[in-house]
């Protein structure tokens, strides 16, 4: 081939445009939302030189082969777990159905893959010191099994504290299983992992597909955070394992996050969620433990698992259902705010019903493009009557929902497209007025440390900044 041929580069450009057209058609046929399909298709058609490679890496969001494989693995896992006489909580499930507050969430019994269960005890854990203090103490007291799953594990001070503690417990004969996301924990050195394995800890990476191909399919990430000790205590929330979550890394410090400790039958659901992801990574089941008896009283909880292999968009539908259930108020905190049309409409309708609708977002960005897109959506929400606040002391990372005076949800899901459709997420729904009062007090203090966004602020934003926000919003469906 004559590279000096004057037509050579024309052929190359034509071939790239042909590939871009094919990729655009693929996006239109496979991307799960119309906004996402358009956000991919337009640049693939007009500027394929810059978008073909990102589409290969971040696109292909239907990922049919993976979704099919994941669903098959889930069926295998449930068949294997069926022989264990699992879920012996008939009384707890019957009691849960008698809750008037839970009845307001009419879609939840069928939306959630796990049942709502009564007789749980929950404890609110505010920020990193309280959260990891409780988790580490529970690990120290472990006698049989420890299940740990995080999106991010860092080899820093907090990560090494966890490593040391797990090695001590493994030496005592405790069975330990650790699952981390390969993308979220990409910086975790092999030496950290090898040290745990050599010490008797079973540790695996969660990846959407084995081998080198996983490097090019990084959209699906396991964002869940789970710790279960001896089948008795469970922990779920927004923290990962890293010094930043302890508020030790400026400029995002102090870090604001929330976790929950739970004791009771819903801990079995946490184990089942962990087992599902562990089975995907290993094709083996971890040991699952049930206490001889559950507490005789306590609160109603339901674990909501969601992910890209679901038959429906579970996470987005959960937020829509929670917002629609609100009669007096719905307060939501999230580090990112990139809602889909259904969630935006639900927020607007809640305002029109006279509901006190509030959003608490960070005032400091950890991802500038996402922050810019979130800012424009925040201005739209303010124009719709939603009260939007920016938390000022540090970075806000907690994911909390408070509905009226009885319903709360705390976990890993953000109010954005990635959590709605791409990530594996986990939320703990709690129906109890006393616990809701604790969450209300926590959020009231957070709102007191925040600045409310005004309509005037949106008008005063510089045109160049507005342009940047609109470009960010244009690509927000694929962020």
UniProtKB/Swiss-Prot annotation:
Residues 218-245, 392-419 form the PLD phosphodiesterase domain. It comes from Pseudomonas syringae pv. tomato (strain ATCC BAA-871 / DC3000). It is an enzyme of class 2 (transferase). The active site is at 223, 225, 230, 397, 399, 404. GO terms for cellular component: plasma membrane. The keyword Ribosomal protein does not apply. Its EC number is 2.7.8.-. It is a multi-pass membrane protein. It catalyses: 2 a 1,2-diacyl-sn-glycero-3-phospho-(1'-sn-glycerol) = a cardiolipin + glycerol. Belongs to the phospholipase D family. Cardiolipin synthase subfamily. ClsA sub-subfamily. NCBIfam families: bac_cardiolipin (TIGR04265). It is found in: Cell inner membrane. This is Cardiolipin synthase A. It comes from the Bacteria. SMART domains: PLDc. GO terms for molecular function: cardiolipin synthase activity. Catalyzes the reversible phosphatidyl group transfer from one phosphatidylglycerol molecule to another to form cardiolipin (CL) (diphosphatidylglycerol) and glycerol. The chain crosses the membrane at residues 8-28, 38-58. CDD domains: PLDc_PaCLS_like_1 (cd09155). GO terms for biological process: cardiolipin biosynthetic process. Its main location: membrane. Keywords: Cell inner membrane, Cell membrane, Lipid biosynthesis, Lipid metabolism, Membrane, Phospholipid biosynthesis, Phospholipid metabolism, Repeat, Transferase, Transmembrane, Transmembrane helix.
